[in-house]
C-alpha cells in the first residue's frame, strides 16, 4: 500500500504473553466481597508480629527490607492469592486485615513495604521519587499542586498504576 508504513515487526508475536483483562471491567454492584478479599489466618498475623520483632532487633532502612529476609509462608500464600486476584480477577485486592492497632505506625510501614514486595516491585509514589506516601488530610484546599490524598476531598474510586501489565 503506497504511503503507508509497515509496523508489523513491532507486533507481539506470542499472544499468550498478553495479560487478560477478563473480569477487570465491572461496576461495584457486580462485585462480591469474596471477589476481592483475602483474609489472613492466625499464623499470618503471627508472622507479621515476627517481622516487627525482627526489624526492631536488627534495624534496616525500610527500603532495604525484602520478604526473603523473613520466614513468612502464610503471608506469602495470602499475598500470592491477592496478586492472582489483581492479575487475573477483578484487578484489585484487599488484605483483611493487617493488625494496625497492635503496632506503631513505623513498624507497620516496614511490614507494608516488605509485604508489598510479594505483589511486585515497589515503585515511586510521586514524581520526586517518594517511595512511601502518607495519605493524610493536611488541611490544604484541593487544587493545582495539591494532591487529593492530602486533603479531605472525596476521591473517585480508582486503582493506581493500571498500566502495570504493559
Regions found by a protein language model. Give the residues of each.
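Fe(II)/2-oxoglutarate
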Residues: 1-81
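Short N-terminal secondary-structure initiator segments
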Residues: 21-42, 110-133
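Conserved small/polar residues in nucleotide/adenosyl-binding loops
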Residues: 164-166
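Short acidic/polar capping segments at secondary-structure boundaries
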Residues: 100, 161-162
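Extended, Lys/Arg-enriched charged tracts that mediate electrostatic binding to polyanionic substrates
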Residues: 115, 122-160
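Generic structural signal for short, flexible, solvent-exposed coil/loop and linker residues
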Residues: 15, 59-64, 81-87, 121-124, ...
Amino acid at each position: 500500500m503506497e504511503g503507508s508504513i509497515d509496523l508489523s515487526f513491532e507486533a507481539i508475536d506470542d499472544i499468550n504473553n498478553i495479560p487478560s483483562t477478563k473480569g477487570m471491567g465491572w461496576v461495584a454492584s457486580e462485585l462480591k466481597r469474596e471477589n476481592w478479599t483475602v483474609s489472613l489466618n492466625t499464623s499470618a498475623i503471627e508472622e507479621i508480629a515476627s517481622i516487627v520483632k525482627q526489624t526492631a532487633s536488627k534495624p534496616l532502612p525500610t527500603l532495604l527490607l525484602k520478604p526473603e529476609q523473613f520466614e513468612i509462608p502464610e503471608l506469602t500464600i495470602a499475598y500470592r492469592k491477592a496478586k492472582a486476584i489483581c492479575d487475573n480477577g477483578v484487578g484489585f485486592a484487599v488484605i483483611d486485615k493487617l493488625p494496625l492497632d497492635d503496632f506503631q505506625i513505623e513498624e507497620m510501614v516496614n511490614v507494608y513495604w516488605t509485604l508489598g514486595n510479594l505483589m511486585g516491585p515497589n515503585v515511586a509514589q510521586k514524581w520526586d521519587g517518594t517511595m512511601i506516601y502518607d495519605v493524610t488530610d493536611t488541611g490544604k484546599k484541593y487544587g493545582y499542586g495539591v494532591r487529593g490524598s492530602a486533603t479531605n476531598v472525596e476521591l473517585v474510586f480508582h486503582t493506581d498504576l493500571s498500566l502495570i501489565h504493559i
